[in-house]
Amino acid sequence: MESFFNNTFATLIAYIGIIFTYLLVIPLLLFYWMNNRWNIMGKFERLGIYGLVFLFFPGLILFSPFLNLRLKGSGKG
């Protein structure tokens, strides 16, 4: 079991998992959360979301050309 933890392959897999989570999974969850709750968030929830946006900014930048958070208007004009 000790040789598994000293293995370079296991370390590489761990890094890939962390990077995948940091750059892809959590930013997509943040986009989904903000898109669904933007108009009904409380002040502490909004403060927490702003903190998470600051923390996961690199991943959000990766998705920003493809996703947007434009509010849906009345459709007139």
Curated annotation (Swiss-Prot):
Segments passing through the bilayer: 12-32, 47-67
Task of the protein: NDH-1 shuttles electrons from an unknown electron donor, via FMN and iron-sulfur (Fe-S) centers, to quinones in the respiratory and/or the photosynthetic chain. The immediate electron acceptor for the enzyme in this species is believed to be plastoquinone. Couples the redox reaction to proton translocation, and thus conserves the redox energy in a proton gradient. Cyanobacterial NDH-1 also plays a role in inorganic carbon-concentration.
Molecular function per GO: oxidoreductase activity, acting on NAD(P)H, quinone or similar compound as acceptor; quinone binding
Enzyme class: translocase
Protein name, as recorded: NAD(P)H-quinone oxidoreductase subunit L
Catalytic reaction equation(s): a plastoquinone + NADH + (n+1) H(+)(in) = a plastoquinol + NAD(+) + n H(+)(out); a plastoquinone + NADPH + (n+1) H(+)(in) = a plastoquinol + NADP(+) + n H(+)(out)
Subcellular localization: Cellular thylakoid membrane
Originating species: Prochlorococcus marinus (strain AS9601)
Broad class of where this protein is predominantly found: membrane
Matches recorded under InterPro entries: NADH-quinone_OxRdatse_su_L
